[in-house]
Amino acid sequence: MKRTYQPSKLVRKRRHGFRARMATKGGRGVIAARRNRGRKRLSA
């Protein structure tokens, strides 16, 4: 059986990266929430 997690740096960046987050209103909310919380890493 094939495992569900097949790591790919490109796919990770495209789906969860900073620019992907900033592209939608909800994503900008995620970044804002993580900034307010003081997260060291905002996105993948």
UniProtKB/Swiss-Prot annotation:
Name listed for the protein in its UniProt record: Large ribosomal subunit protein bL34
Ribosomal protein keyword on record: yes
Signal peptide: none
Keywords, in A-Z order: Ribonucleoprotein, Ribosomal protein
An example Gene Ontology molecular-function term: structural constituent of ribosome
Taxonomic path: Bacteria, Pseudomonadati, Pseudomonadota, Alphaproteobacteria, Hyphomicrobiales
Domain of life: Bacteria
Gene Ontology biological process terms in this record: translation
Family the entry assigns: Belongs to the bacterial ribosomal protein bL34 family.
Any one of the GO CC terms: ribonucleoprotein complex
Ribonucleoprotein recorded as keyword: yes
Organism from which the protein derives: Chelativorans sp. (strain BNC1)
